[in-house]
Amino acid sequence: MTAYSKHYNAIVIGIGAMGSATCYQLARRNKRVLGIERFDIPHDLGSSHGYTRIIRLAYYEHPSYIALLRRSYELWADIERTSGEQLLYRTGSLDCGPADSWVFKGSLQSCVEHDLPHEVLTGAQVSERYPGYRLPRENLAVFQPDGGFLVPERGTVAYVEAAHALGAEIHGREALLDWEPWGDAVRVFTDRDEYTADALVFTAGGWNQNVLPFLRGLAVPERQVLAWLQPTRPELFRPERFPVFNCLVPEGRYYGFPVFAVPGFKFGRYHHFEETGEAETLSREAFREDEDVLRDFAARYFPDGAGPTMILKACLFTNTPDRHFLIDLHPDHPQVSFAAGFSGHGYKFASVIGEIMADLAERQATRHDISLFNLARFTGQVSQLHQQKMDMLARGAWTPAAHGPAHPLYRGDSQRGREVPGGALGRLHDHRQPATVRPSGDSGRWSLTDTADPRHWTDSDVKPFW
């Protein structure tokens, strides 16, 4: 190893949200770390910009996310203390849709299962409490008070500055040309220099598939467009009067934010026009047809927010086939790890992803349950990380108390270690079984009741969360 003076404990490729947090976590462990970013730090060509990003504790996508979210909130508070800057703003969050929709049911179930404070509101009640909203009266919404938004560009800067203060070396405008295993270590070649490291971490967003060919087709870049419209009644769209939202309506699934940083109410449609391609070539321009589909939504459901257009901006999603993340060790080289495919709902996790990736770089294992995110679910090729877990399970050496859940479908912290893969809760989060939402007794609380036997499921019952 001494043949190369530019040797590091870890090199991180891609210094956006995930990479900057990873550099910080490694540096605070006294590791010699190098971060390499091909663009500016921060930049607006990937998925870590746009003034605001939603964070929410109610999570309809899958129960495995809740434990990570709790840790993510803790770590965002940690970097706020370190930087002296507010990065997380709590507005509350609303997950809205028809009573039988997977958005509403999944959000409610996550609150019930994990004992999160929440309220169930009708569309009419939402509009009464938050007059900027004009949802269908018969729709239902879960309000969870811990939701809000993060400031992405400032988050990246905060992590980079904190990493610098701990001795990390971070280079912008330096492009990766190639990498190769070098015994148990790696060699990295850029357009400026050559380096070696004990571990290599890829957090390169839409560019991951270019340097990890096995991710091609599994972490696919997609063009996404956001609008900022000047409200005609701006007082209704201030953070204290306008929760962040995820709304499922006949036109699609939309998400949005109060006015912050720029004079516009920000919102977008998930998977906009489903335009996929190479991160390098997908258009970052926004066009009239982009504006039209977004403006039509605002005019119908947020009419007091549908004033003049302030900004139209494109960014990237990087999607997996099932819209769950990809976080794992390289299947052939365990000194290499990657975090990819955050599918439009990853930024909020950046703080905990940094901790996970630092774990993988340091010891090729993590304290967190990331079994939902393994590569083998698509390829059948099991990484060393998950082979270790399966071997421990076979020996009876895996204990939830010491290692976390062995199965991705677990209840909350109060019932950790109790699997529910075949029960109604597990099925609900997979969105495979219809349910009825109804008031529970005289308390006015809402609950979910099974209305179908899983033995009688049909293809039409199987609904992926996106």
Segments predicted by a language model, with ranges:
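C-terminal catalytic lobe of FAD-dependent flavoproteins
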Residues: 296-403, 407, 411-413, 423-425, ...
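Short beta-strand to alpha-helix junction loop
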Residues: 67, 95-103, 143-162, 282-290
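Helical element adjacent to the flavin cofactor pocket in flavoenzyme catalytic cores
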Residues: 143-199, 203
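Dinucleotide-binding Rossmann-like beta1-alpha1 core, especially the glycine-rich loop
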Residues: 52-129, 139
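Active-site substrate-recognition segment that forms the wall
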Residues: 24-28, 84-90, 194-195, 199, ...
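Glycine-rich FAD pyrophosphate-binding loop
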Residues: 27-48
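Beta1/beta-strand and adjacent pyrophosphate-binding region of the FAD-binding site
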Residues: 4-18, 34
